[in-house]
Amino acid sequence: MSKLTKKQKLAFSKIEPGKAYTISEASALVKEITTTNFDASVDIDVRLGVDPRKANQMVRGVVTLPHGTGKQIRVLALCSPDKEAEAKEAGADYVGLDEYIEKIKAGWTDIDVIITMPAIMGKIGALGRVLGPRGLMPNPKSGTVTNDVGAAVKEVKAGKIDFKVDKTGIVHTSIGKVSFSADQIRDNAREFINTIIKLKPTTAKGTYIKSIYLSSTMSFGIKVDPKTVDEN
């Protein structure tokens, strides 16, 4: 492991070993300990007491963060011609169909989200090898396969994200930027955690939320006390 810089040592010294911080404290502290020269992402890791290998314990969902993600989300709308104007007006960065399908087949993936329609999914199935590994495959459960293309584009642009538990039982996502206020980070974290709580599988036994950590790009993780999620 490389040696810590002076800035990193100072940041590390601000975290009390073994302490679980309130969600408000952690949201303020993550801003203090970030030493990057760019607007780093604020990440959250929630470890769940589930067995993701069992289909009835898979946790997957969508959430619209109250303050957005702080990221510029590049949206491709693969839709029929009659929906193109609606998609463009909603803010889609790329709108079309066959020409973009051919681009993707050739390896183009400079996008963050694809919105499409049920009638078009047959054409998109062949793109699974390219889109699947990158997490770009549209899915009805995440609201990215719909006839209401305009509304779906607006939701994604406003900060809607989809998530799922990984094979180790952790849900990981970015919930903002360090340039956000501590209150904005707290609000986004709270919304994300409460959404996960609502999705608790009925078959999950024991403690559901095992641990919560907040961090930023290249920062140390800050342990959050789950009991404080709804505290101000």
Swiss-Prot record:
Domain of life: Bacteria
Keywords on record: Repressor, Ribonucleoprotein, Ribosomal protein, RNA-binding, rRNA-binding, Translation regulation, tRNA-binding
Coiled-coil regions listed: none
Disulfide cysteine pairs (residue numbers): none
Molecular function in Gene Ontology: rRNA binding; structural constituent of ribosome; tRNA binding
Record carries keyword RNA-binding: yes
Signal peptide span: none
Subunit structure as annotated in this protein's UniProt entry: Part of the 50S ribosomal subunit.
Function: Binds directly to 23S rRNA. The L1 stalk is quite mobile in the ribosome, and is involved in E site tRNA release. Protein L1 is also a translational repressor protein, it controls the translation of the L11 operon by binding to its mRNA.
Family note: Belongs to the universal ribosomal protein uL1 family.
HAMAP family hit by this protein: Ribosomal_uL1_B
Name of the featured protein: Large ribosomal subunit protein uL1
